[in-house]
Amino acid sequence: MDKLKRDVKEETSRQPCFLYPLLFQEDLYAIAYDRHFNRSSSFEPMEDSSYNNRFSFITVKRSISRIRQQNGSIIPFVNCDQNQLVGHNRSFYYELVLGGFTAVLEVPFSIRSKHYIEGMNEWTSFRSINSIFPLMEDKIPHSNYLLEIRIPYLIHPEILVRTFRRWIQDAPFLHSLRSVLHEHRNLIISSNLDQLTLIASKEKKRLSLFLWNYYAYECESLLVPLWKRFYHSRSLSYESFIERTPFYRKIEHIDIFSHKYKHLKKSIWFLKDPSIHYMRYRESSIIALRGTYLLVKKWRYHLTNLWQCHFHLWLRPYRIYIDELSKTNNCFYFLGYLLSVKMKTSVVQIRMLDDSFITDLITKEFDPIAPTTLLIGSWAKEKFGDISGRPISRLAWTGLTDNDILDRFDRIWRNIFHYYRGSSKKDGLYRIKYILRLSCAKTLACKHKSTIRVVRERFGSELFTKSFPKERESIFLSFSKIRSQRERIWHSDIIQRNFLVNS
């Protein structure tokens, strides 16, 4: 793989970039073969390993020779008949071709994105999901409006080919890629893993994720430098400018229809600190702005025209929602949380030279809440309970051992507790814990053909202490009490779907 990266780096240093000859290298298909059977990088465990006995590098070598004899075109191999590969599975070798396309595209893309990120040192944190929650907790309370963008989950193949053509000028490779994309249009879907389950092939999932991430990267690579050039510097935190808050409030209450203050309104408006923040996770993007409603509508108009003219993406304005954070009970759904901004009143004693008085200081606070109703609905789909939240037994796991059942419930609860422990209210988490506890007990009772009381008497205190250990929760709770109440501990290490639920 390192040798392939060096070869591609040498090719990309010269213009134009020729990638088509790499499809005829046998090492490329060896890489695709290793990825195909690599359990650590797969989406789900391999259940059928019968391909191991049917794979042969000799057949791949003969297929490459056949491609070279047919005017160097890989398309006949892609569209070949099942009878042309006698004794071998045509779909499996087609998966290797898709793996070859993915490996060729990933290498120059990684080199290109690395150069882009190295030139923007202060934006390196946007690649990490761990930086999203602290950024939202620190910046969103100081914003007035949010732009929620739903990126279309279907992209036309020609749009991707046009974007690839900006940095790949190898016509045969682009024609081959166009043939693959037009033949399988379901490859170009969103990065939502629920929709990716519709794609049965592992290499198709990998290529689909790459195409989606590449397209999102192209959109972001144009927006980030544009905003940096527009604001010239990153916005400062408003916590250090508490004394300027009354000044901003006076600006908002200036009568703009008065001729006396009209010029003053225009001159003072540009003294305000600009604030704009961009976050994306999968197909959802959020732009936090501080300004007026007219400014937010202008941003939506310019973003729509930019994507339509530059990326040929006909993004309608109704796909960009405007949320006003100043309204009460106005929340938005992002990263599995119901997020909102609430007003917090603090009693402050102000001392002067001769006197002191007590006043109220109203501040904005970031308020993340775990969506209990949505979680209960997801549990109902996975057969852990009904739609009303009543636990039921997990019949698919009754064939497992008792330790396996307890370990699976323990893993599910640990992931949920780690991810949603940044929530301001823990009542919903305790309700989910109650559902999982009774579902675990009912699953064991169904396996042993007994009742929940018999299961409790049989396992005793080991039933729930083993599946839901309290030591881990007590450590987290004690550690959170030591820290300030304003700070939260985010455990955002869960970025992949748990496929134990579907087993």
UniProtKB/Swiss-Prot annotation:
GO cellular component annotations of the record: chloroplast
Subcellular location, in the record's words?
Answer: Plastid, Chloroplast
**Chief location of this protein within or outside the cell:** plastid
Specify the superkingdom.
Eukaryota
Keywords per UniProt? Chloroplast, mRNA processing, Plastid, RNA-binding, tRNA processing
What the entry lists under InterPro entries is as follows: Domain_X, Maturase_MatK, Maturase_MatK_N
**What are the protein's GO molecular function terms?**
RNA binding
Q: Which GO terms describe its biological process?
A: mRNA processing; RNA splicing; tRNA processing
Q: Pfam families, from UniProt? A: Intron_maturas2, MatK_N
Tell me its family.
Answer: Belongs to the intron maturase 2 family. MatK subfamily.
- State what this protein does: Usually encoded in the trnK tRNA gene intron. Probably assists in splicing its own and other chloroplast group II introns.
Any idea what this protein is called? Answer: Maturase K
